[in-house]
UniProtKB/Swiss-Prot annotation:
Entry similarity comment: Belongs to the ABC transporter superfamily. ABCG family. PDR (TC 3.A.1.205) subfamily.
Species this protein is from: Arabidopsis thaliana
Summary of the knockout phenotype: Increased susceptibility to the oomycetes Phytophthora brassicae and Phytophthora capsici. Decreased abscisic acid (ABA) uptake through the plasma membrane and strongly delayed up-regulation of ABA responsive genes (e.g. NCED3, ABR1 and RD29B), and associated with a slow stomatal closure in response to ABA and osmotic stress resulting in reduced drought tolerance. Impairment in ABA regulation of seed germination and root development. Early seeds germination on imbibition without stratification, and reduced abscisic acid (ABA)-mediated inhibition of seeds germination.
Function of the protein: High affinity abscisic acid (ABA) transporter that mediates the import of ABA, with a preference for (+)-ABA, through the plasma membrane, especially in guard cells, and is involved in the intercellular and intracellular ABA signaling pathways leading, for example, to stomatal closure, thus conferring drought tolerance. Together with ABCG30, import into the embryo the ABA delivered from the endosperm via ABCG25 and ABCG31-mediated export to suppress radicle extension and subsequent embryonic growth. May be a general defense protein.
Name recorded for this polypeptide: ABC transporter G family member 40
């Protein structure tokens, strides 16, 4: 079709290369002989005669070397090696090769006069608002959670007004993003950058209110599909960890398709044939391969891997929390590449450089620039800290702050605009850094250039208004006033199809990916098989046929118990779908919203592909247990049971997938899952007989899948030959009599009804899963919290809010209220090694140790700020961990002294602080509480409360945290503080310990220029108080680098190559390296840190033939440093070694009190855990109360007792299971904080464990009382004080047992995922041995011992013996009293209650003690 696009002559290209030099267009390979040319010409002539469809799928593949064969190939069968060789020929080494390839593609398109589509994005008077809670109401406390829930409900009914306040994110912004020009989006955190990018890409959250207009080529967003026309590349790296980088790209490419590239190629081939033009064979294959949908080996995938520098890790797993994979920087590039492989024509990229070094960022941005310039692409990219050379690649700049656009237009005029406002960029300052700081209240004054006028703070609003009258602003206003001529929009520019490829291809790709993931997760399936095998073995040996009779109705109860447990085993086996589905949801939401595929395409493959697994799991269960237990020997009945269990397994899998999609996070889904299981379980006909179900709950009986499964499996068994013996005085068989007595449906056809119903549930739940995926979005979006302040000046309020700081006094050196002793640290010939990794031994390495630090020397002094630098892998963090005593493994040699005395880690921990790169804090406390807690535990006992409080206030001012004192810390990337605020909190938490020596690991990583400046100002303030501070730092800007006094530079392999002062404008450092022969001189204005790392690489060493470590050791500087080390290694006259009478600052009791204080706030402000558990308990109590209404007092028949026991058994098992499952993620988060705090010497493990255990006791007590009161009254147990107390006591003990078991499982395993998998096996065994499914007297003698080890068995013993053990009334269907019956049938004696009560205390105590031992003994953090 005329004029369709190769759009982007490939998007692929979309990113590629370097600076511009147009290629002359000569062919890549000149043929070595006329014969080769003739052969190629003949093959090309044959190709030209083919029909268009076939011609576009064929190409001429030339050999890599002269004289090689020339083959005609099918593009869709292009192999991996062919693709690799093709790209090697097209893109040789060097950035400009990418650019040359793009020019060749463009030249081929231009030669036949095809116009490529372009997109101009305009936004006019765009305003975006959110509704947020204000002040203290925004904190997620227990009370607020309940209030907010009630408010939302009442507001929906229009009974109360909305209490949320409007918060403007973007305030009336307008602008144009033009094709063919690279646009950079700059602005401080919370300025609205991400919101603007989302609005322009058509991906804004529906809850946000948007006014104004966004158009593409003059067309409104409703006239095309913006999600497929534009690609939004987000900040968060959301990927499937079990896929490799290449697979991630390949599937993304297959889902997105090729857009209009194929149509463009058709038109291109037609025109070339008409004009008799023969294209370059390699370029021809490249373009055809990029334009062919559905390829498994995609040229685009390999091309983007090459551009992004990901070839080195192409076949490495992406990885996640559980699976080791690629680095953070590589993951960030995968996020970018995933969209670049698609056909989108406009790119909106959000902070794509986080975690990347400046040279990698430069290469990626340069490649994008080449694509944008050559193919007139549209790109708006936000970057955090662009280096000057990267900044200069952009044509246009959009500067945004507080939701207002301050500048938008050519990069060349941006400095001019600020000069008209009176601000000047200093000579050694990057323009990007200047732009981010000049709007900040804290930083603006230093750039004021009008010395004749007094400085006053210029607000963002004033900048925005001034820009409207600036010549660039006026020009943009004029352009926006003229509407875009829609007739000039290329027909292929805007995508109108919802999905990139046809339904058939989408389904095929989705099946392929799901099958791959199932293979990668095969361990889960093997584990489940193993678990089923163990449970099947336990079941068949517990219900052994020699012990089982078929003579009475009591025998029928045992067979019912066995069948019920087999059903439940397969039901619980489906629970693993919950966590596996939730783990993949973030990727699904991202790809669904980007219109990769509809929800049903995602949900269909796991359903169909897991059917064979259901057959295998059911086979494992049925064929092992059937004959050993002694079910009816008919083979037909065996296979009928097998089919039923297959359907049961499928139903459970579908149910838990649906629950996962409805819940969307583990805590909520676990709660939903437990609730669904409870309803189905309690109303399934086993726990509560159908005849006793109240009329208001009978609907629950008829919708319970377990009811259909149970009735079908019982009909299959009890209508068999084994149970056909007639009962005395009755015409009915034993089987029918038993079914009727227990309230089951006594008809053989119920097998077929049950089977059909289960099949229906499988379809229904899978349909529900698909609906939930289609209409629900992910939970937990971060929201702004507005401070509750008088809004007399709205601008001022907004300014304070976005700055996150208020103006403090001038930064002067200051003393602190608490004195401290300055200390120096020296290290001489420090060697650190680890055991040789197994993979290196397998590759033939002879040594048994790998040396990471090779005899490093240095001294860090008070009042001196030292930068610890080096390339990746040089050993920066390793050296810091060794000096700080944070290493948990390896071998350390050498001398380390503190003020001349040998270092002792226990005393050193008291005078040092360590700011880790990952900011680990308890998420549910405020900033102020975090500091109070740290100071409480780390300052000496002599410091009283008032002094401590004053000191905390001083530290908060020093670190600029005063305005954030009541802000909740939150979880990184999810809620609470921003990255930069968390970084300052990390520093403050260490400072309130009043340390003499502070280590900081990457304090500025992941921050924008303004935030980095705030953190560095904090660090500088800290040094100016006379402390010794050492920072590792990665790719700093000039002003950050030159804020340091000294540099400690390591090269790869762990050797120092420069240790000394930087000097004014880094002169000492520059002079040192420039004195080495062959080193390139630094250019004017170039960053000395970047230059220093570039000239000291291993490749430079090889080129110059020198060893920089040896050069340093031969220098005067080294000799001076050795003298300094020698001097500082001698104790000062009259000084004493560090001595503290106790290991920790505070007593054991104080440690316990402080830990408990923090846990109190952590629990109070964690409503997803505490409030949901509370509400869940009330819901379950009301449900049970109404289900078992007034059944507690009925003891006339066995079924009456069975019903009462069922209510207890179900509550103990399910509420307990819910407690254990929900506590595990909470303990797991806090354990990570514990590792940091214990390493800092804040407390011993026991006070922490005590607090974690003790805080649960009141919460669980309230849970037990609430549950007990509601249920006891509604079920109608006997109202005596003793019986009510026993009931509460045993329920409380049971809840505590499960809660502490859940905590113990986390303490003994690396994370809560593994803990939950291990726990599920125990829950199944406890269920089996609880005494409900098979009473203790009926158990084979070889299993009776385990009954006494089962905590659930003791709880049920206590509950039933205390309620019914004293009732001497005779039963209607037995010649025994209630007391005799429960003693004979269940083995329960009232006189044994004292022992039972003791065991009810011992189990929680045992699990709590094991939890404490686990926390103390196991450290799963490897350093």
């Amino acid at each position: 079709m005329e004029g369709t696009s190769f759009h982007q002559a490939s998007n692929s290209m979309r990113r590629n290369s370097s600076v511009w030099k147009k290629d002359s267009g000569r062919e890549i390979f000149s043929r070595s002989s006329r014969e080769e040319d003739d052969e190629e010409a003949l093959r090309w002539a044959a190709l030209e005669k083919l029909p268009t469809f076939d011609r576009l799928r064929k190409g001429i593949l030339t050999a890599s070397h002269a004289g090689g064969p020339i083959n005609e190939i099918d593009i869709q069968k292009l192999g991996f090696q062919d693709t690799k060789k093709l790209l090697e020929r097209l893109i040789k080494v060097g950035d400009d090769e990418h650019e040359k390839l793009l020019w060749k593609l463009k030249k081929r398109i231009d030669r036949v006069g095809i116009d490529l589509p372009t997109i101009e994005v305009r936004f006019d008077h765009l305003k975006v608002e959110a509704e947020v809670h204000v002040g203290g109401r925004a904190l997620p406390t227990f009370v607020n959670f309940i209030s907010n829930f009630a408010d939302k409900f009442l507001n929906t009914l229009h009974l109360v007004p909305n209490r949320k306040k409007k918060f403007t994110i973007l305030n009336d912004v307008s602008g144009i993003v033009k094709p063919g020009r690279m646009a950079l989006l700059l602005g401080p955190p919370s300025s609205g950058k991400t919101t603007l990018l989302l609005a322009l890409a058509g991906k804004l959250d529906q809850e946000l209110k948007q006014t104004g207009r966004v158009t593409y080529n003059g067309h409104g967003m409703n006239e095309f599909v913006p999600q497929r026309t534009a690609a939004y590349i987000g900040q968060n790296d959301v990927h499937i960890g079990e896929m490799t980088v290449r697979e991630t790209f390949a599937y993304a490419a297959r889902f997105q398709g090729v857009g209009s590239r194929y149509d463009m190629l058709t038109e291109l081939a037609r025109r070339e044939k008409e004009a008799n033009i023969k294209p370059d064979p390699d370029i021809d294959i490249f373009m055809k391969a990029m334009s062919t949908a559905g390829e498994k080996t995609n040229v685009m995938t390999d091309y983007i891997l090459k551009i992004l520098g990901l070839e080195v890790c192409a076949d490495t797993m992406v990885g996640d929390d559980m699976l080791r994979g690629i680095s953070g920087g590589q993951k960030k590039r995968v996020t970018t590449g995933e969209m670049l492989v698609g056909p989108s024509r406009a790119l909106f990229m959000d902070e794509i450089s986080t975690g990347l070094d400046s040279s990698t960022t430069y290469q990626i941005v340069n490649s994008l620039r080449n694509y944008v310039h050559i193919f007139n692409g549209t790109a708006l990219i936000s970057l955090l800290q662009p280096a000057p050379e990267t900044f200069n690649l952009f044509d246009d700049i959009i500067l945004i702050a507080e939701g207002e656009i301050i500048y938008e237009g050519p990069r060349d005029h941006v400095v001019e605009f600020f000069e008209t406002m009176g601000f000047k960029c200093p000579p050694r300052k990057g323009v990007a850094d200047f732009l981010q700081e000049v709007t900040s209240k804290k930083d603006q004054m230093q750039y004021w250039a009008r010395r004749d006028e007094p400085y006053r703070f210029i607000r963002v609003r004033e900048f925005a208004e001034a820009f409207q009258s600036f010549h660039v602003g006026r020009r943009i206003g004029d352009e926006l006033a003229l509407p875009f001529d829609k007739t000039k929009s290329h027909p292929a520019a805007l995508t109108t199809k919802k999905y990139g490829v046809g339904i058939k291809e989408l389904v095929k790709t989705s099946f392929s990916r799901e099958y791959l993931l199932m293979k990668r997760n095969s361990f889960v399936y093997y584990f489940k098989f193993g678990q089923l095998l163990v449970m099947a073995f336990l079941t068949m040996t517990l219900f052994f046929r020699t012990e089982m009779q078929k003579k009475t109705e009591v025998d029928g109860s045992l067979y019912t118990g066995a069948l019920f447990f087999i059903l439940m085993m397969l039901m619980f086996n489906g629970m693993s779908e919950l966590s596996m589905t939730i783990a993949k949801l973030p990727v699904f939401y991202k790809q669904r919203d980007l219109l990769f595929y509809p929800a049903w395409v995602y949900s269909l493959p796991p359903w169909l592909l897991k059917i064979p697994i259901s057959f295998m799991e059911a086979a494992l269960t049925t064929f092992i247990t059937y004959y050993v237990i002694g079910f009816d020997p008919n083979v037909g009945r065996l296979f009928k049971q097998y089919i039923l269990l297959v359907l049961m397994n499928q139903m459970a899998s579908a149910l838990f997938k649906m629950v996962a999609a409805l819940g969307r996070n583990m805590i909520v889904a676990n709660t939903f899952g437990a609730f669904a299981m409870l309803v189905f379980f309690a109303l399934g006909g086993v726990v509560l007989s159908r005849d006793d179900i109240k009329k208001w709950w009978i609907w629950g009986y008829w919708i319970s899948p377990i009811m259909y499964g149970q009735n079908a499996i019982l009909a299959n068994e009890f209508f068999g030959h084994s149970w056909s013996r007639a009962v005395e005085n009755s015409s009915e068989t034993l089987g029918v009599t038993f079914l009727k007595s227990r309230g089951f449906l006594p008809h053989a056809y119920w097998y077929w009804i049950g089977t059909g119903a289960l099949l229906g549930f499988v379809v229904l739940f899978n349909f529900g899963f698909t609906l939930a995926l289609t209409f629900l979005n992910s939970l937990g979006k971060p929201q702004a919290v507005i401070a509750e302040e008088p809004a007399s000046d709205e601008t001022e309020l907004q300014s304070a809010r976005s700055e996150g700081v208020v103006e403090a006094g001038a930064n002067k050196k200051r003393g602190m209220v608490l004195p401290f002793e300055p200390h120096s640290i020296t290290f001489d010939n420090v060697v650190y090694s680890v055991d040789m990794p197994q993979e290196m031994i397998e590759q033939g390495t002879q040594e048994d140790r790998l040396v990471l630090l090779k005899g490093v020397n240095g001294a860090f002094r008070p009042g001196v700020l030292t930068a610890l630098m080096g390339v990746s892998g040089a050993g920066k963090t390793t050296l810091m961990d060794v000096l700080a005593g944070r290493k948990t493994g390896g071998y350390i040699d050498g001398n380390i002294t503190i003020s001349g005395y040998p270092k002792n880690q226990q005393t050193f921990a008291r005078i040092s602080g360590y700011c880790e790169q990952t900011d680990i804090h308890s998420p549910h406390v405020t900033v102020y509480e975090s500091l109070v807690y740290s100071a409480w535990l780390r300052l000496p006992k002599e410091v009283d409360k008032n002094k401590r409080k004053i000191f905390i206030e001083e530290v908060m001012e020093l670190v600029e945290l005063t305005p954030l004192r009541q802000a909740l810390v939150g979880l990184p990337g999810e809620s609470g503080l921003s990255t930069e605020q968390r970084k300052r909190l990390t520093i403050a938490v260490e400072l309130v310990a009043n340390p003499s020596i502070i280590f900081m690991d990457e304090p500025t990583s992941g921050l924008d220029a303004r935030a980095a400046a705030i953190v560095m100002r904090t660090v500088r303030n800290t040094v100016d108080t006379g402390r010794t501070v050492v920072c590792t730092i990665h790719q700093p800007s000039i002003d950050i680098f030159e804020a340091f006094d000294e540099l400690f530079l390591l090269k790869r392999g762990g050797e120092e190559i420069y240790v000394g002062p930087l000097g004014h404008e880094s002169t000492h450092l520059i002079n040192y390296f420039e004195s080495i022969q062959g080193i390139n001189k630094i250019t004017e204005g170039y960053n000395p840190a970047t230059w220093m790392l570039e000239v000291s690489t291993t490749s430079q060493e090889a080129a110059l033939g020198v060893d920089f470590a040896q050069v340093y050791k031969n220098s005067e500087l080294y000799k001076r440093n050795k003298e300094l080390i020698k001097e500082l290694s001698q104790p000062a006259p009259g000084s004493k070694d560090l001595y503290f009478p106790t290991q920790y600052s505070q007593s054991f009791l104080t440690q316990c009190m402080a830990s408990l204080w923090k846990q109190h706030w952590s629990y109070w402000r964690n409503p997803p855990y505490t409030a949901v558990r509370f509400l869940f308990t009330i819901g379950i109590a009301l449900m049970f109360g109404t289900m078992f209404w007034d059944l507690g007092g009925k003891t006339k028949t066995r079924q009456d007792l069975s019903n009462a026991m069922g209510s207890m058994y179900t509550a103990v098992l399910f509420l307990g299971l819910q407690n254990a499952a929900s506590v595990q993620p909470v303990v797991n988060v806090e354990r990570t904080v514990f590792y940091r705090e214990q390493a800092a010497g804040m407390y011993s493990a026991m006070p922490y464990a005590f607090a974690q255990v003790f805080i649960e006791i009141p919460y669980v007590l309230v849970q037990a009382i609430v549950y007990g009161l509601i249920v006891y009254a509604m079920i109608g147990f006997e109202w005596t004080a003793v019986k009510f107390f026993w009931y509460l006591f045993f329920m409380y003990g049971s809840f505590l047992t499960f809660t502490f078991y859940g905590m113990m499982a986390v303490a003994m395993t690396p994370n809560h995922h593994i803990a939950s998998v291990v726990s599920s096996a125990f829950y199944g065994i406890w269920n089996l041995f609880s005494g409900f499914l098979i009473p203790r007297p009926s158990m084979p003698v070889w299993w009776e011992w385990y009954y006494w080890l089962c905590p659930v068995a003791w709880t049920l013993y206590g509950l039933i013996a205390s309620q019914f053990g004293d009732i001497t009334e005779p039963m209607a269907d037995s010649n025994m009293s209630v007391k005799q019956f429960i003693r004979e049938f269940y083995g329960y004696r009232e006189g044994f209650l004292g022992v039972v009560a003791a065991m009810n205390v011992i189990f929680p105590l045992l699990f709590a003690v094991i939890f404490a031992i686990g926390i103390k003994s196991f450290n799963f953090q490897k350093r």
